[in-house]
């Protein structure tokens, strides 16, 4: 893979989903929604317990965005990030976790 001369933009996001939903399903939706500038999706935490429903889990991801031709603007990253949230909440019946 080509290495970009431009900086990565890294964002973390967590979703609460039914325990039966597999992380791989969510990752596929994230990658499809993230567009060509989303370079990677990595799970960094899976949580069950307090503040999460009995049949639910929280899965947290680190998303890395980059463009090989320019530095990404805040707006470009925010637009992609918002599309990811919309798609995951709709297609995976997920809730954005705010804490």
Task: Give the residues covered by each predicted segment.
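A carboxyl-terminal module marker
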Residues: 1-99
């Amino acid at each position: 893979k080509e290495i970009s001369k431009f900086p990565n933009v890294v964002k973390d996001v967590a979703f609460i989903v039914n325990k039966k939903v597999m992380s791989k399903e969510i990752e596929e939706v994230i990658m499809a929604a993230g567009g060509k500038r989303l370079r990677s999706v990595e799970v960094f935490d899976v949580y069950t317990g307090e503040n999460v429903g009995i049949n639910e889990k929280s899965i947290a991801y680190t998303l890395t965005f980059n463009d090989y031709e320019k530095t990404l603007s805040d707006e470009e990253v925010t637009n992609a990030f918002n599309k990811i949230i919309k798609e995951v909440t709709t297609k995976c019946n997920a809730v954005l976790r705010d804490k």
